[in-house]
Amino acid sequence: MKNKIHKYDFLVVGAGLIGSLTALNLCKKNFSVLVVDKNIELPKDDRTLAVNANSKDFLKNIGLWDKLKTKPSPIEKIIIKDNINSSPLIFENSYEEMGNVVFNKELLSKARNILEQKKILIGGLNIDIFNILPKKNILIKGKNYF
């Protein structure tokens, strides 16, 4: 049996939140993408993420926002304190939300589900990125990258 060779526009190394969202955005722009990670188990993570209006639009555009089961909590008030000034700086808006709070784990879970449905997520691969990078510098807009 002959091995089939797949060609991709992008290889995303790391299926964490940033890698998964990057891959979904590239797919949305009709690029072929492969996402690899050594461990694709969801982390035991109860952290939350504050999402501003632009980020919310981005998540809607890649099809994630409406898939969240837990209703995002609106941010209606922001209090900024420091140890120099005694008075806090308070931003309050009762007319519209200034952002939302979502659970990292749920966002990552939904992103990974989409990647798995598209069959572009591979786990169990420990890739040494330095072994796949070009062996010469790359010039982009007058800057050298290696």
Which residue ranges define each predicted feature?
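Beta1/beta-strand and adjacent pyrophosphate-binding region of the FAD-binding site
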Residues: K2-I18, L34
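Glycine-rich FAD pyrophosphate-binding loop
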Residues: L11-V13, N25-R47
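Short alpha-helical segment within the catalytic ATP-binding CA
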Residues: S20-L21, N54
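N-terminal FAD cofactor-binding segment of flavoenzymes
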Residues: D45-D82
